[in-house]
Amino acid sequence: MNNDKIVTPSFCYILAANFLLFFAFYLILPILPFYLKEEFMIGKSMIGFILSCYTLAALCIRPFAGYLLDTFARRPLYLVAYFIFTAIFGGYMVATALTLFIALRVVHGFAFGMVTVAGNTILIDILPSSRRGEGIGYYGLANNIAMSFGPMIGLFMHCLLYTSDAA
């Protein structure tokens, strides 16, 4: 039997941070179309474009994220990207212009791309090499659990808290 531990404080922190990252992502994903339609009165095509800006930005930053993580200290890059990712949620609430919302969406995607690559890299650094596959499996499980509950809770909160549909 292998005595290399997976469950360490560092692993628990990165696992919890990964769950919260994806939970936040999936929490707002199903309600953003409603928000964009109601706040900016735009059509489905524009909503689709705005939502895709996030993913495209995340895709564009990932190759550069790997280089940055190999060149600079990983933990500070991870924490800065995570902070930006979190702060952008507040920006969505105060964005009164559609162009500002789109810009926030792009920055949010960059932060998401950076923090996911950084999280995966840090995970590999902290796992014992003999149990990396198992540790990565648990780490990925956090994404799936967030995917299972995030959209449901987001839509529930939207239905519960949004009052303009009550008329």
Where are the predicted features?
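Helix-loop boundary and gating motifs at the non-cytosolic
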Residues: S10-F40, I47
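Helix-breaking motifs and short loop linkers at transmembrane-helix boundaries and internal kinks
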Residues: M41, A73, V94-T99
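Residue-level signature of mid-helix packing/kink "hotspots" within the transmembrane helices
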Residues: T55-P63, M147-S148
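Helix-to-loop junctions at the C-terminal end of transmembrane segments
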Residues: R62-A73
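Structural signature of the two symmetry-related core transmembrane helices
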Residues: P76-G90
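Paired small-residue
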Residues: T99-V107
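Cytoplasmic helix-loop-helix junction between adjacent transmembrane helices
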Residues: V106-L141
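Conserved small/polar residues in nucleotide/adenosyl-binding loops
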Residues: Y162-A167
